[in-house]
Amino acid sequence: MKQILLLLTAFFISCTVSVPHNAPVTTIAKGVDILQQDYEISKGGERLPTKLFIFDVTLSNRISLKATTADDSNTAICSSHERNTAIAPISKQLEMMQRNNKQIKVLGGVNSDFFHIKSSNMICGVMYRNGECLKGSYDDQSTIFALLKNGTAVCVTSAEYEAMDKSLILEAVSGRQMLVNDNVAQSSESKTFHPRTAVGVTKDGKRVFILVADGRRKGYSNGLSYADMVTIFKKLGAYDALNLDGGGSSCFSINTGRGQFAPLNRPSDKSGERAVPNGIAVIYRR
């Protein structure tokens, strides 16, 4: 984990669009670090702050990832608009997962899928839990983050997903824009800055970086552009990375003890944590 801090430090020193203020690293389990970073971004000629939160996860027999749902059940996810998909804040989803699974310790997690927030709350992409496909359809822009049964993780395009052996998938959630694909930075015409949630993996699939950036609070944090995320994931060492649901959905929640969870970041909605359909949990197998 020290290597990643050195990489980040070198990046922040050399970067022309971001200036570091601190880079605290907290180890919450062997193989799981939380990195926090203060940035300054250049936006419209102004230098503005942005705060980052990153889970640096080395997958192993003990450390893994699980897809979350509103009530920790597969039936919470609906594959059509015929009924509403259940939603809950990520912290509540993690609490429910912890309550129902005493054989694991839930360390924290983030939101994941884009969803139909103005109608049925149906997620826009595919989702798997415990090897079961809960939703197999996806929209044209979908990308997929998956944990495979061999313990490695992948970020893939929809075309790459179609070519996969689906029986190998253990957990999966979906995003949209690919940020890095086969070690190649992906360009975007969008120059807007928003709160962000994103995930990246190393080439061997054994290391996962889960990023949340706060935004929409000028005096506190102003978000990231796609180009910023590309640069960050490349410097982290991601071979593939993709963008998850951001904006008011972006939440980086951690275990605060006694089965309780709370955001380490500051979600941008005035009401606090937004209720969402699903997320990614970082877990320790006891």
How would you label these PLM feature ranges?
Residues 4-13:
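Sec-dependent N-terminal signal peptides
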Residues 16-138, 143:
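Zymogen propeptides
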Residues 40-43, 48-56, 174-205:
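Conserved beta-alpha junction segments in alpha/beta enzyme cores
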Residues 59-63, 151-152, 200-209:
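Beta-strand-turn-beta hairpins that frame and shape the catalytic cleft
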Residues 69-76, 159-164, 212-218:
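Short, solvent-exposed aromatic-acidic interface loops
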Residues 107-111, 144-146, 154-155, 200, ...:
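Structural recognition of the beta-strand scaffold that forms the well-ordered cores
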Residues 110-191:
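Active-site-adjacent helix-turn-beta-strand microarchitecture at beta-sheet edges
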Residues 119-138, 188-203, 207-240, 249-286:
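Conserved, well-ordered active-site substructure
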